[in-house]
Curated annotation (Swiss-Prot):
Belongs to the ketopantoate reductase family. This is 2-dehydropantoate 2-reductase. It is found in: Cytoplasm. Its EC number is 1.1.1.169. GO terms for biological process: pantothenate biosynthetic process. NADP(+) binds at G7, A8, G9, A10, I11, G12, N103, E286. The active site is at K205. Keywords: Cytoplasm, NADP, Oxidoreductase, Pantothenate biosynthesis.
Length: 326
C-alpha cells in the first residue's frame, strides 16, 4: 500500500510517524524547508507517552519524485489546498484515494448527498471549483481529526493527547478502500472508526470551531475564558444555534445539545484556539473553512445567520488588518 502524506506538519507528521514505525506501508511525505531537511537527515522523530522514537521516512520536496499513490492524505490547512493543486497532481493515479484532513466544511460536501444540492460547489472553500475539478470528489475519503499534536522542532513531533481519526465515505458506504486504510491505521496504534455519516461528525467538531475560533481571535481569550464570561458564552451559543439550524436542514444529526458542547469547550481549559494562535503568529487564518462556508450553507438552505454574519465581518476585517487573510 503506497501512502503519501502531503503536508507533514503536526497532524501529518504524527500520522506519518505512526505508520512508519509500524512499517507495514510504503510511506512517503511531502514537506519543505527546515522540516524536510531534518527528516531527510535524521528521520521523523516522535515523542509519545514520554518516549522518543525515530521513524525512517521517505521525504521529498516535490511530489514528482514519488509518483502515483494508492492513498494521498491531505494534511495541510484548507486555505492552502488550492495553491497546492499543481504539486498534488503527480500523486494522483487512476485509482488513487484522497483522504481530506482539513478542519471545517469540506470542498466535497455535496458529493453523493443526492437531492437538489447534489454536486454544488462551495465557493468559500473551493473558489471556482478548482479542487473539485482537479482532484475529483469521487476519490475522497472524509475524516475528522482529534489528536492534539505539536511540532517541537524541525523533524520532531510531540503527541499531546488523542489518537482518533474518524474516516468515512461521502456516500456512507463501508467500501474496501476505507476499510483497508482504517485497518492499517489501527495496526499502527491509532483509532480509526469508519463512520456511515461522516458529515454529521464533521459538523459536531465544526460546531465549536465556527464560534469559539473567531471569538477567541477577536478577544484574545482562551476557551475557558470565553465560556466563563456570560456575554461571550451567549454569543457563541447563538452562533451555534444558527449553525445547528443549517446543519439539521441538511440532514445532519447532532448527538449532543448545544450547552453540553459549550461545557466541553470550557473543560478544555486555558487553551488558545488555532485561529488565535495563527493571528498572534501572523499566519493565514482558517476563516473561510470554519465560518464563511457555514454562512454560504445558510444561504443555500435559506436559514438566517445574523450573528455568524456579524462575527465573520469582524474577524475577517481584523485578519485583513493583520495580514492574516486576503
Amino acid at each position: 500500500m503506497k501512502i503519501t502524506i502531503f503536508g507533514a506538519g503536526a497532524i501529518g507528521g504524527y500520522l506519518a510517524a505512526k505508520l512508519a514505525i509500524a512499517g507495514r506501508t510504503d510511506l512517503s511525505i511531502v514537506a519543505r524547508g527546515a522540516h524536510l531537511e531534518a527528516i531527510q537527515a535524521n528521520g521523523l522523530r516522535l515523542i509519545e507517552d514520554g518516549e522518543e522514537s525515530m521513524a525512517p521516512v521517505r521525504a521529498a520536496a516535490k511530489a514528482e519524485e514519488l509518483g502515483a499513490q494508492d492513498y494521498v492524505v491531505l494534511a495541510l490547512k484548507a486555505h492552502s489546498l488550492t495553491p497546492a493543486l499543481d504539486q498534488i497532481a503527480p500523486l494522483l493515479g487512476d485509482h488513487t484515494s484522497v483522504v481530506t484532513m482539513q478542519n471545517g466544511v469540506p470542498w466535497w460536501y455535496f458529493h453523493g448527498v443526492g437531492g437538489p444540492l447534489e454536486g454544488t460547489r462551495l465557493n468559500a472553500v473551493d473558489p471556482g471549483g478548482a479542487i473539485w475539478q482537479r482532484i475529483g470528489p469521487q476519490r475522497v475519503i472524509g475524516s475528522v481529526v482529534y489528536p492534539a499534536v505539536e511540532v517541537d522542532a524541525p523533524g520532531l513531533i510531540r503527541h499531546v493527547e488523542g489518537k482518533r481519526f474518524s474516516l468515512g465515505e461521502p456516500s456512507g458506504e463501508r467500501s474496501e478502500r476505507v476499510t483497508l486504510l482504517a485497518e492499517e491505521m489501527v495496526k499502527a496504534g491509532l483509532q480509526a472508526p469508519v463512520r456511515d455519516d461522516i458529515r454529521s461528525e464533521i459538523w459536531v467538531k465544526l460546531w465549536g470551531n465556527l464560534s469559539f475560533n473567531p471569538i477567541s481571535a477577536l478577544t484574545g481569550s482562551t476557551l475557558a475564558a470565553i465560556v466563563a464570561d456570560e456575554g461571550t458564552r451567549a454569543l457563541a451559543r447563538t452562533m451555534m444555534l444558527e449553525a445547528q439550524a443549517i446543519g439539521e436542514s441538511l440532514g445532519v444529526r447532532f448527538p449532543i445539545g448545544v450547552d453540553r458542547r459549550i461545557k466541553g469547550a470550557g473543560d478544555v481549559g486555558e487553551h488558545k484556539t488555532s485561529m488565535l494562535q495563527d493571528l498572534e503568529r501572523g499566519r493565514p487564518m482558517e476563516i473561510d473553512a470554519l465560518v464563511s462556508a457555514v454562512q454560504e450553507l445558510g444561504r443555500l438552505v435559506d436559514k438566517p445567520t445574523p450573528t455568524i454574519d456579524a462575527v465573520l465581518a469582524l474577524v475577517r476585517r481584523l485578519a485583513v488588518e493583520r495580514g492574516c487573510y486576503s
